[in-house]
């Protein structure tokens, strides 16, 4: 029930405000048992409090979570650290004999490279500084972004003889 999941969140984060609509770990576990096998990928594109990722991790599934709000910092990252460290004793931990382990990577997406100006023309986003622009162009053109310490014009490379220089 929703009450169960709120209690799970209070155990994990006694000092912070409860998340508005957490899902109980047992519900997510049941859905995953019916639809996935260990090692499968689970995607939660509205991660919220991180329940799906926590359950997937405890059940030996690989997972991707996406969250645009601050929940990443207030709930998801601290929660997953507790799962990995074996400090999360609630939810399905006992049922799946979870002891801790594993890890995760956190990525922060950059703003969109292009935006429309007031006339509707596509222009480089003002949020990009020259280094960010060079990195984005390297990525788009298949170069490795690796600015040289000795040559200003070598911001990236694709081979030993192919270099890229991006100017603004």
Q: Would you name each region that the model predicts?
A:
Residues 1-3, 25-39, 59-168:
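Accessory, often C-terminal, charged low-complexity segments
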Residues 46, 57:
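Short alpha-helix at the nucleotide-sugar/activated-sugar donor binding site of glycosyltransferases
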Residues 3-22:
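Class I SAM-dependent transferase core
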């Amino acid at each position: 029930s929703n009450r169960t999941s709120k209690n799970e969140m209070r155990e994990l984060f006694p000092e912070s405000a409860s998340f508005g609509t957490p899902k109980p770990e047992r519900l997510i576990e049941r859905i995953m048992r019916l639809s996935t096998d260990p090692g499968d990928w689970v995607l939660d594109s509205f991660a919220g409090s991180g329940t799906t990722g926590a359950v997937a991790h405890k059940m030996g599934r690989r997972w991707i979570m996406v969250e645009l709000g601050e929940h990443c910092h207030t709930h998801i990252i601290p929660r997953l650290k507790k799962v990995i460290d074996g400090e999360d004793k609630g939810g399905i931990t006992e049922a799946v004999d979870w002891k801790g382990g594993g890890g995760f990577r956190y990525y922060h997406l950059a703003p969109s490279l292009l935006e429309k100006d007031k006339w509707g023309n596509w222009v480089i986003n003002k949020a990009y500084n020259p280094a960010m622009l060079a990195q984005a162009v390297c990525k788009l053109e298949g170069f490795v972004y690796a600015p040289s310490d000795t040559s200003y014009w070598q911001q990236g490379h694709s081979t030993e003889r192919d270099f890229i220089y991006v100017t603004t």
